[in-house]
UniProtKB/Swiss-Prot annotation:
SUPFAM superfamilies assigned: MFS general substrate transporter
GO MF term list: carnitine transmembrane transporter activity; creatine transmembrane transporter activity; monocarboxylic acid transmembrane transporter activity
Membrane topology designation: Multi-pass membrane protein
Annotated stretches, region: Disordered: 242-263
Gene3D superfamilies: MFS general substrate transporter like domains (1.20.1250.20)
PANTHER family, per the entry: MONOCARBOXYLATE TRANSPORTER, MONOCARBOXYLATE TRANSPORTER 9
Keyword terms of this UniProt record: Cell membrane, Membrane, Transmembrane, Transmembrane helix
Protein name in UniProt: Monocarboxylate transporter 9
Chief location bin: membrane
Keyword field contains Cell membrane: yes
Organism encoding this protein: Rattus norvegicus (Rat)
Homology family: Belongs to the major facilitator superfamily. Monocarboxylate porter (TC 2.A.1.13) family.
CDD domains, alphabetized: MFS_MCT9
Catalysed reaction equations from the record: creatine(in) = creatine(out); (R)-carnitine(in) = (R)-carnitine(out)
Length: 508
């Protein structure tokens, strides 16, 4: 059952506004968790690697659970999922204020808040796409900046709340603010279906029998059977209440014996239903095999395989600065009075700018989005390697701005995926890539923290991060170079291109 045509405006702009504030409220604290990270280090006295798991889980769980989030939104709709997820995020933040140890935060802040954010992201993107068609890119760009603006504001807000109310009070207030997501969700009016104004149950006779395993003649015979044909008689009586415990003997005459036999039509129906279940299970298994086959075919595309490696390495190396920059400044002995603007705030506002500008740049026909994405990866890797050389607030602020701007390449990642696999395989491929992006988000900060615990300095940690991102960028660059297209041209050409890779590599 399809939805009516996207209005490309009207109530859709209300959807854009509430989706913007939904992402602002849910992602503000998890993305600005670097401010809380420093406080948790002092409060619980755990290592940097272990403490970093809290923030990395909050960002990674939502991406790891993206298939489940999509299933919930498609089953229940954006409005119920948004309201439910608002309770999850608010409850997780408030529960974190009661955390007795770091392991409690793994659950309350990392898993509960992270899962709520993943559900909210899927819900806001889904309903925005339903309301917009020709202006979909603009609408998605506007709502995606909500998380970046939230990072910018929440970094300063959480620091101020900690000064006035302490860490526990800060988490309680931020959790209370997250309850405004419920109001945003209530305004997410779903589009009516194209064939009926309200959802109605379809009459059974109107449903096509796709899994029929017996012919119409047999069904008609079963439907026209009388009550007596099935082995029952009008003379049969129910036992009175007083006769329940009394033993009865079976009738010895042939007519009575017929009643004790299981009727043949009933046996036939049991066999038919058993076969039906077997056939349905076989179809489900075939769907699963087809899914695995499609996944395997995606990885036969060299560009997609390189993109998979690049996004994994990018998130392992590129995500830690958004979580750890505040502690990096403290470890480099930058004075508190010099931190006029939190480094996390600079990172956040430049991420919003990067999303908008890179998204606009990707719309130009003369720009190859694959090469643009590779350029952001390589420059990000170089900026990460430069962090150990920055020992002052000014240089750290400049690098935070550069890294934030380049992290805005998330806005062009769907373009890159589409160009790699085609629009027909976008949903499947994007889900796989987001899963591994979540894996990288979850692993990156703890790895950097472990390097610090091992060496007592962030220098080697950020050299490692920069190397990961550079490696991913160069692997993707080698996969899309035109020379691969020329190598393919020397081989015997089939009647039609069998992979999308040839098209991508030759499109310079």
């Amino acid at each position: 059952m399809g939805f009516q045509k996207s209005p490309d405006g009207g109530w859709g702009w209300v959807i854009v506004v509430v989706s913007f504030f939904t992402q602002f409220l849910c992602y503000g604290s998890p993305l600005a968790v670097g401010v809380l990270y420093v406080e948790w280090l002092d409060a619980f006295g755990e290592g940097k690697g272990k403490t970093a798991w809290v923030g990395s889980l909050a960002s990674g769980v939502g991406l790891l659970a993206s298939p489940v989030c999509s299933l919930f939104v498609s089953s229940f709709g954006a409005r119920p999922v948004t309201i439910f997820s608002g309770f999850l995020v608010a409850g997780g933040l408030m529960l974190s204020s009661l955390a007795p140890n770091i392991y409690f935060l793994f659950f309350s802040y990392g898993i509960v808040v992270g899962l709520g954010c993943g559900l909210l992201y899927t819900a806001t993107v889904t309903i925005t796409c339903q309301y917009f068609d020709s202006r979909r890119g603009l609408a998605l760009g506007l709502i995606s900046t909500g998380s970046s603006v939230g990072l910018f504001i929440y970094a300063a807000l959480q620091r101020m709340l900690i000064e006035f109310y302490g860490l526990d009070g800060c988490l309680l207030i931020v959790g209370a603010l997250a309850l405004n997501i419920l109001a945003c969700g209530s305004l997410m009016r779903p589009l009516q279906t194209s064939d009926c104004p309200f959802p109605e149950k379809i009459a059974p006779e109107n449903v096509p029998d796709r899994y029929s395993i017996y012919n119409e003649k047999e069904k008609n015979q079963e439907e026209t059977m009388t009550f007596q044909d099935k082995g029952y008689s009008n003379e049969d009586k129910c036992l009175p209440n007083g006769d329940w415990g009394r033993e009865t003997s079976l009738p010895k005459n042939p007519t009575g014996a017929a009643h004790t036999k299981e009727p043949e039509p009933y046996k036939k129906k049991v066999v038919e239903q058993t076969n039906f279940c077997k056939q349905l299970a076989k179809r489900k298994w075939q769907v699963y095999r087809n899914y695995c086959g499609e996944t395997a075919s995606l990885f036969k595309n060299k560009v997609f395989s390189a993109l998979f490696v690049a996004i994994l390495l990018f998130d392992i190396g590129g995500f830690p600065p958004s979580l750890l920059m505040e502690d990096v400044a403290r470890s480099y002995h930058v004075r508190e009075e010099d931190l006029t603007i939190p480094l996390i705030s600079i990172f956040g506002i430049m991420t919003a700018v990067g999303k908008l500008l890179l998204g606009i740049l990707a719309d130009f026909k003369w720009v190859n989005t694959l090469y643009l994405y590779v350029a952001t990866l390589i420059i990000t890797g170089l900026a990460l390697c430069a962090i150990p050389l920055a020992k002052s607030y000014v240089t750290l602020a400049i690098l935070s701005g550069i890294l934030g701007f380049l992290t805005g390449n998330w806005s062009i990642f769907p373009y890159v995926t589409t160009k790699t696999v085609g629009i027909d395989k976008l949903a499947h491929a994007y889900g796989i890539l987001m899963f591994f992006a979540g894996l990288g988000n979850s692993l990156g900060p703890p790895i950097v923290g472990w390097f610090y615990d091992w060496t007592q300095t962030y220098d080697i940690a950020f050299y490692f991060s920069g190397f990961c991102v550079l490696l991913g960028g160069f692997i993707l660059l080698l996969a899309i170079l035109p020379c691969w297209g020329m190598c393919n041209q020397r081989l015997p050409k089939p009647a039609a291109p069998t992979t999308f890779f040839y098209k991508v590599a030759s499109n310079v």
